[in-house]
Amino acid sequence: MTMIACLAERLDISEGQCREFLEGASRKYKSFLIPKRMGGYRRIAQPSKELKRYQRAFLDLYHFPVHDNAMGYVKGRSIKHNASMHASNPYLFKTDIANFFNSIKPQLFWWVLEQLAKKETKSKQAADLKIERLFEALVTEKRFVNELLFWRPGKRSEKLILSIGAPSSPTISNFCMFIFDEHISALCRDFGITYTRYVDDLTFSTKTPNILPGFIHKLREELKICLLGTMDLNLDKTHLSSKAHNRRITGITLTNNENLSIGRKQKRYIKHLVHLFIKGDITEDDFSYLRGYLSYAHYIEPEFVVSLFAKYTCNVMNRIVYRQDY
């Protein structure tokens, strides 16, 4: 069955209705700006409600491989899993990819799909050719796939890019990074380096000193080769650190005894809010933040939350956690 036929069946509509909707689907977005944490603005493009339904149906029908070292938007993996991969290594190198989602274009998607299909054909039996069958199912309707998955940012623009805001974008972005993740992982194994990628955040760590500073050149080369020159590193967010300095990965602190922590600054602030609660001076907004952050702290560093129960008594902490008598 063609992609149009599969989508139509999944959505319980006719093939004609499906084809008609996908004509110009790349323009069915509402865009707006949100402030970035470090200054500036990020443009979010939100698909229409109906387009989201099509995109989710597409993901239900077609499954794209994700590399083992990709930690973001993958079931069973998280920021905690990402940080824990590096906890035992004293030397750390972090960077990120500039303008990540909007740098992913249809050309990269189809190139990665074709390369993986060719590689699979050489190495597997016909019955196991999942990527090859995926490629064959989609390539005959390339124009409609592009309209479904990519956003056209300007009224007169012919350019198509992946949007921040579409339910299909996380899966497609991870897939488009597969060859890069594969190449970098192999390169890192040769150098005794641990590598993970959380969306656009790249993290490298090792037990061997003086390896990581020279690694950035190899990394930029692989970006050009594996991503068709569409992406580059954000050099302003490139940092080297070691046990002698504060090591943080996706907001989580790596302690010198190889554990994960929310960090001393956050612990002090949480205790401050608990004191405000005890005195009856906490605002509704701060109380909501406290409850939410306690849940996060319990996930990252449960021992800290246990220590709060011991210090402030179960009665006080239960009133916060379960919103008793507030």
Indicate where each model-derived feature is located:
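Right-hand nucleic-acid polymerase module
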Residues: M1-I34, Y41-L129, A137-A166, F175-C188, ...
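Conserved, non-catalytic sequence blocks in retroelement Pol enzymes and Pol-derived host proteins
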Residues: S169
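Short beta-strand
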Residues: T194-Y198
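Short beta-strand->loop micro-motif that forms the acidic, two-metal-ion catalytic signature
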Residues: D200-K207
